[in-house]
Structure formats: C-alpha cells, structure tokens
Amino acid sequence: MNQRNNLIDFSDREKFFLYDVSGLGIDLDNKFDDFGVTNILRKQTAKAASLKAKLLVGQNSPIAYEVFVEMFEFLNSPPFKMIYETDAGLYYRDCVLSKLTKGDMEKGRVFIEDIAFDFTGFYYQWKNQSYSPVENIDGNGKIYGWSVYPYNYESDINGVGGVFQIDNNSLLFGLEGSSPVEVTIKGPCENPSWEITNGSKILQSDAYNLAIDDGYKLVVSSFPGEQACKLIAPDGTSSNVYQQQDTSKTNFVSIPIGQSFFVFHNFGKNVEFKFKEYRGVT
C-alpha cells in the first residue's frame, strides 16, 4: 500500500507475482564486552532489513507494458506499507523502495525483474481503544428507604471513564522499546491532559492549555516522522498547537511494553487512541 492508500497485490498471478522472496525476518547487531573466556552482551540493536525478490510482471496479461507503467505509478507515491497475512493474522511493515530492475520483455510477453524494499521497522498490528462518556440523567439512581431521611444516590457514570488498562504485547527480542501512539480528543472541553501510569508511578504525561470547541478535535501523534499536535476544525483544516503544549510534562507519550494504565482528564465527547503492537517476526 502506498501513501495514497492504493494497493498492489503481488500474489494475484494476473499482473504481478513475487517469488524467491527473502528478508522477511530480522537481523540483530550484538556488541559484547570481553572478559577472558566470557562475553557479556553490552548492546543489541536491530539492523536494517530488506525484502528481496524476483518480480514477474504481466504473466497472464496481454498488456505487460501497461501493467509495468501501472506499477511505476504506484511506486511514485512512497513510503509504503507491506501487508502480510498469515495464519497468525494480518500485519503491516513500513518500507521504502531500494531496487527495481528493468530489462527487455521475456518470451511469453512477461517481464522478470529484481525488486527490493528496505524496511524501516518491525511488523505491527494496530490496537485501538475509545471511550465516550454516557450522559448522566437525573433520577437514574437508587432510593434507600431504611434511613430516617430517604436519599436518592446518583451514580457518577462519567467518573468511571477515561481510564484504560493496556497490555502491550509487543515482541522485540529483548530490544528496548515502546509503541508510539496517536491520541484524539473531541470537544467541547478545556485543558485536556493524560498520563501513562504503572501503579502509583506516572511514567509519562502530556497536557494542552487550550479550549476545544464542539465539533473540533485535538490530535497528538508520537509516531516517528509524524510527530505532531494539531487542532482540526469541522471543515478538516488544521493548525499546530505546539505553543499550547505544557512543557512541564514529558510530552508525546508512548506505550511501554507490558501492562500499564492510560489515564485521561478533562476530555470532551470522546477520547480515542491507537498504537502499534510490534512483532520482530511473524
């Protein structure tokens, strides 16, 4: 899938077909400190990985040249997401083109070329959660009649919202890391804030000193290369709100591996967020 959300199926056997595929795993770079006959792992990082394959273009098509042009147009809108589906589920992996050969048409009016993509991260699945407060209606409480003065106890419905337990089950092969997250707050509300906690400890936090009118929404993203905080109007126009970000917070939070809590304050009609749960190999 390219930046315009156009898709090419490299397994359809009609226009495009990949074979002799390699590079779907990971490659780790290990740094050791030597102590006599013992080596102690000091640092571990993931090397850049590349998908390499043979590409057959126009196998069952009478217009192989036009099919090749179709692929050129697709590749003209980077970056790309590889969509990889197995028995374990559907995963994405971000990538950029690194090689595409172009030779003469082979017998049978097909092209057989080399193609390669450099991956910019691990496989991932999207994880989404949201909460919309329920309107607190007068009279939806309970009457307890055993006291001297019967009292109508209203349930604080809104008070239970905005707290999410998160289980980030990313598999990073021992590498340190966390999952970037995109938060969306829909107005009306004032001075929204949120934090990630573990027990009583606040791990990360973010806050914005601004009013969000009805119909507007605040979108804050910590995705690498897409880090932003913007206010989006009902007509789709957006404006940066960096100046309204509370710099006393850690800002641009990410979801740690394992269990944690995502706690929101002063949100409006709806709060939602999505993050990437990573897999080194799938």
Which role does the model predict for each range below?
Residues E66-E73, V110-E113, Q129-V134:
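"Short basic amphipathic alpha-helical interaction patches in structured regions
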Residues V134-T282:
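Intrinsically disordered, low-complexity segments enriched in serine, threonine, and glycine
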Residues T38-I63, R109-F122, S260:
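Oligomerization/assembly interface segments of phage tail-like spikes and tubes
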Residues M1-D34:
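Polar/acidic, low-complexity leader/linker segments enriched in S/T/G and N/D
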Residues L7, G58-L100, F261:
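Short, acidic/charged, Gly/Pro-enriched secondary-structure junctions
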Residues Y19-V21, D29-N30, Y91-S98, L203-L210, ...:
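Short amphipathic beta-strand/extended segments with alternating polar/hydrophobic composition
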Residues L55-Q59, T101, F119-Y123, G187-C189, ...:
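Beta-strand elements of well-folded, non-transmembrane domains
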Residues L18-Y19, G25-I26, K81-N128:
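Short beta-strand and beta-hairpin "edge-sheet" elements
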